[in-house]
Amino acid sequence: VEWLICGVAALGFAFDIYELLMLPLVLPPALQQLGGVQLGTPEFARWRDLMFYVPAICGGVFGLLGGYLTDRLGRRRVLVWSILLYAFSAGAAAFATSLPMLLLLRCTTFIGVCVEFVAAVAWLAELFPDPKRRERVLGYTQAFSSLGGLMVSGVYTLLATYGAQLPAIYGAHEAWRYTLMSGLVPALPLIVIRPFLPESPAWQRRKAEGTLKRPSLAELFRPEFRRTTIVTTLMFACSYGAAFGAIQHLPQIVPGLAEVKGLPRPQQQQVVGTVQMVQELGGLTGRFALAALAVAIASRRALLRVFQVPGVLLVPLVFAFPATQDLGLLKWGIFVAGLLTVAQFSFWGNYLPRVYPLHLRGTGESFAANIGGRMLGTSAALLTTQLAQQMPGATPAVRLAYAAAGVALLVYASGLALSFALPEPKRQELPE
């Protein structure tokens, strides 16, 4: 049963990121086909910003509700339904016939993803109460998130190459539609194994005894939890800001490089997919590094700074220099940027269950992850695109790369400064 638990959590984490990271890959061709919107035009910028930010707002609001429901209805039930929601939404998006329809389905996908992370982390943390085992399980199952990123890069590259051999959708063989359809995969095994998944024993016991307290958003801001809530929310935003404000703009930056801009569109898509895959390999390495170090380093502040200190120096440089002029060097740089940034996502999955009590765990995690990460953090994508309009540079891609460098410096420096206020968990065991 423990392997089944870890398998479901790993599947959920993998396709959580899979569904999110397909957007930067599918967006340019989807906007072109559904709305006749060309890359580099003001209309493209408007729809790109809408596709990034509107789902983030919806995911943040409904994800917060999902965290509350995780505390009220149980971890397993909310986890399963959140995975089914994002899987079927992504599959339906493959058949979108207009940009508003695609936007609506991206919103429901984002809601499922936002709820899944919170429910899965609380569920796993409570199923494995031994501190060292819990750290390893959370660390290594979350590493599958980066496997999801690798999968979507690989799948998109394959579909861009071999899509013509697949059945046509609306009379065409578009890689972006097939990529969205592949998001259905996690729903299939989950429907079969759902009855065999256990509920969190601690939550179930409290519920049966009638001693489970009612969760409350207001409680997050009482003196006992106020500092934890504010600092973790802002730091989660910084972690997501680095990913969405810089790294996830690569599909728009890479086609502007001298070695790429002269290639036919299918070959450009293959190069973009390759660069994304290198970045995800870096992220996977970072998640495994975090999983190993989480057991070895006692201080949570010290653990996080292992990734923040080099990141504040290196990540802005990657976007300021290689991203504007050298594809080969960019691949090396983006591997490091992915490692340092994505490792921080796993950190929060390990840290947050240790600072909130059982009745408030889902709500507290959800506030940091969804208000901080999904709403504030992902809005860095919008900040970057707006800043790009004021940047120097001969092409839109170069201006976007410089803006990404500036945003990366801002969020990394802010996160490092905030780490000095991050509360250390009082003990190894989860608070009751």
Predicted features, each with a name:
Residues V1-E432:
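Transmembrane-helix signature of 12-pass secondary carriers
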